[in-house]
């Protein structure tokens, strides 16, 4: 199996970013912005306490403006979008498209259930990588997420 490679531009941009920070005397700086625009999820995976632990804030979502400002404030060239399930966010396409337009490298972590509808709103880009989480092959994954058919839909 061939390993997926990161885009060459990402390697150069990251090296330039680090070099620039070091030359300016900065000892600590972010490489990745971890953006969680919401806590809500469309699964209740065994072993994940998110729904239970975050119950008081499950209905809260970052606005597009707050999300983009957080990324800008961080200054990191890479943005990892997770959550909950980020594809539930009603304006996640706007967030992702804006980040791509600004040439951030975006990794969107998803369970894959809502990915098909988003692929119609977000064009392929060298700045975007979809990270679909699976917990093993079909039987194991569906058992882990406590719902049949999730593996097949995600893959």
Where are these regions (language model features)?
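Glycine-rich loops and low-complexity Gly/Arg-rich segments
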Residues: 58-60, 105-107, 131-135, 154-155
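Conserved radical SAM core fold
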Residues: 86-88, 112-117, 132-147
